């Protein structure tokens, strides 16, 4: 009897220390995406130190205030995502988790909308095909914007699933999507600091 209890306790402890497969899949995706962003940022600085002037003549230096505010807003959306993972423990709290994710998604969508507007505005000022600065600048921003858009698709999926009730599978999905947003927010900080480097 004592050995059965010990084995059961050891099994529970092992289960607590392991993560579901979905979590590991997201961790691997994030690792590969971190490599992508690391390569893009390294390319930015490689090109920067090869160029006699950065940005090149005729290209305006990036403005600082709005990108920093927008990044702060994106980072702030991790708070309701985290809170949703914490409250989504019982049936009565699924609704609260749903509203927290919906709040985060609405703010994230607003962030993406403003960023796309700024992206289009920058395209009118200089071209990605004109020089190395334009190429890496627009590539870095476009890749980050694509990650935000993918996150919004994930938000929509989990909102639809949470609307149908909470299961262990959906709870894992919620945690994995929150994990993804933590990464996107962290990368957003790196991207905006790289983008603003000439103006800092």
Protein language model features and the residues they cover:
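...captures the hydrophobic TM-helix bundle architecture rather than a specific catalytic motif
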Residues: 1-200
């Amino acid at each position: 009897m004592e050995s059965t209890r010990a084995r059961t306790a050891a099994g529970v402890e092992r289960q607590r220390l392991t993560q579901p497969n979905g979590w590991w899949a997201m961790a691997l995706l994030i690792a590969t995406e971190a490599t992508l962003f690391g390569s893009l940022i390294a390319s930015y600085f490689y090109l920067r130190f090869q160029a006699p002037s950065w940005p090149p003549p005729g290209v305006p230096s990036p403005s600082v205030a709005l990108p920093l505010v927008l990044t702060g807003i994106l980072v702030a959306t991790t708070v309701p995502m985290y809170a949703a993972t914490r409250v989504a423990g019982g049936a009565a709290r699924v609704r609260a988790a749903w509203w927290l994710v919906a709040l985060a998604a609405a703010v994230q969508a607003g962030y993406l909308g403003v960023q796309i507007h700024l992206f289009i505005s920058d395209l009118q000022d200089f071209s990605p095909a004109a020089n190395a600065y334009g190429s890496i600048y627009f590539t870095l921003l476009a890749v980050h914007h694509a990650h935000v858009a993918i996150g919004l698709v994930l938000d929509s999926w989990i909102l639809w699933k949470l609307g149908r009730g909470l299961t262990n599978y959906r709870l894992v999905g919620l945690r994995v999507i929150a994990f993804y947003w933590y990464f996107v927010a962290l990368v957003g900080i790196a991207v905006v600091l790289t983008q603003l480097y000439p103006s800092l």
